């Protein structure tokens, strides 16, 4: 069923979401990464990217924050582009683990594959697969170019965050070498880990992430730049991964309450994809106990519920002038 709203009405809903949520004091910044602990906890922004390229944004949508685990979506897309859907399914997988995003136990339980590119083990494996094999500099160029194409503008490496991540990524070092033990990493483990750490340290804005989400929702064509970033056949694959594990062990609760596949990161960003309709992103540093932005979750839920939209329903948003 079509749900028609004017652009002005949609802007009003996004503004309402911001106003409703901005005073929420729940959660706290990630404190195990020094850089993230010191980010202003009051920063908050929401951005929506329609498939015609129009964007609606309220609050701190131009502030560059650490992309963190939202980057897993971007690199999963790059791996899908370079290898195809079947090879990624065979070598990495697409299953939720039901365990925390940085779980080592998940590797031990399913050592035939890392489960999904959207948890740490699968993301490190995906970084190892990025072509060309054996060339860290060219791999990095490919990762950054892919993020740029998805977002419609370039990210910026946050050097201080990269240092913080590198100094504290002991668990991920264990993951990389355990993957090597099970032949589930496809380049030098230390190189793959460094690429993963750097990609998590990219600085992006909520506006950029909404455009990236819009690119997925638009079947691989960036709504703003009009560039075809990836083949339309891959859009349902990456969206399925996001729907299955975007909020890790709390993904079921998220899908039940919001109705939109979304990926979260401990930098405070959440990126949601409503196929054929729009991309949405929100950012606020304070996190809940599972590492998900409290305000970003509430803001996206508000927009979805206010508009009566759900990926599992037949409601379809039509924005008219």
Swiss-Prot record:
<feature type="binding site">
    <location>
        <position position="165"/>
    </location>
    <ligand>
        <name>substrate</name>
    </ligand>
</feature>
<feature type="binding site">
    <location>
        <position position="196"/>
    </location>
    <ligand>
        <name>substrate</name>
    </ligand>
</feature>
<feature type="binding site">
    <location>
        <position position="248"/>
    </location>
    <ligand>
        <name>substrate</name>
    </ligand>
</feature>
<keyword id="KW-0378">Hydrolase</keyword>
<dbReference type="GO" id="GO:0004359">
    <property type="term" value="F:glutaminase activity"/>
</dbReference>
<dbReference type="GO" id="GO:0006537">
    <property type="term" value="P:glutamate biosynthetic process"/>
</dbReference>
<comment type="similarity">
    <text>Belongs to the glutaminase family.</text>
</comment>
<dbReference type="GO" id="GO:0006543">
    <property type="term" value="P:glutamine catabolic process"/>
</dbReference>
<feature type="binding site">
    <location>
        <position position="266"/>
    </location>
    <ligand>
        <name>substrate</name>
    </ligand>
</feature>
<comment type="subunit">
    <text>Homotetramer.</text>
</comment>
<feature type="binding site">
    <location>
        <position position="69"/>
    </location>
    <ligand>
        <name>substrate</name>
    </ligand>
</feature>
<protein>
    <recommendedName>
        <fullName>Glutaminase</fullName>
        <ecNumber>3.5.1.2</ecNumber>
    </recommendedName>
</protein>
<dbReference type="InterPro" id="IPR015868">
    <property type="entry name" value="Glutaminase"/>
</dbReference>
<dbReference type="InterPro" id="IPR012338">
    <property type="entry name" value="Beta-lactam/transpept-like"/>
</dbReference>
<feature type="binding site">
    <location>
        <position position="120"/>
    </location>
    <ligand>
        <name>substrate</name>
    </ligand>
</feature>
<feature type="binding site">
    <location>
        <position position="172"/>
    </location>
    <ligand>
        <name>substrate</name>
    </ligand>
</feature>
<dbReference type="Pfam" id="PF04960">
    <property type="entry name" value="Glutaminase"/>
</dbReference>
